[in-house]
Amino acid sequence: MQPTRILPDLQCSLMCEEVRQEANANFFLIGVLGLIRVPQLPVIAFKLSVFNRWTAGVGQFIETTRFIAPDQTTVLRKGEVKFSLQEAGQHATNVTVFTQVEFKIAGTYYVEVLVDDVMKLRYPVPVIHTPPPQPPSAPPVPPAPAS
């Protein structure tokens, strides 16, 4: 008997600056983010991409990807996509793009990945405020000799 529905496994989830697809259908990820370092706050990120790959499932599914604020309740961005896997040996790759994300405060933000409302992964994305270095102050100018 052939199973009609098996919830898939999340093979990977990576936040990056951009995802591109080559002519041969392979993906390459640009700027994989482990943290986000910013020189000032608030700041707006033009684009953040979340690359998710699913495998070992059978059926039709809805993936939900959420970007959560440091208070762990405010959903800053949310994306949903439908996908299907015909057999357990297949995989599906989804890319969710979040645009114009405003970081008002430093702290730990979170990416949550769900399939059919079942949480598969939640991982931290620290936003660190690192002000640019200040130029060294010039030494005081000695007074001009009196003539």
Name what the model sees in each region.
Residues 2-106, 110-147:
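Contiguous segments within soluble domain cores/interaction surfaces
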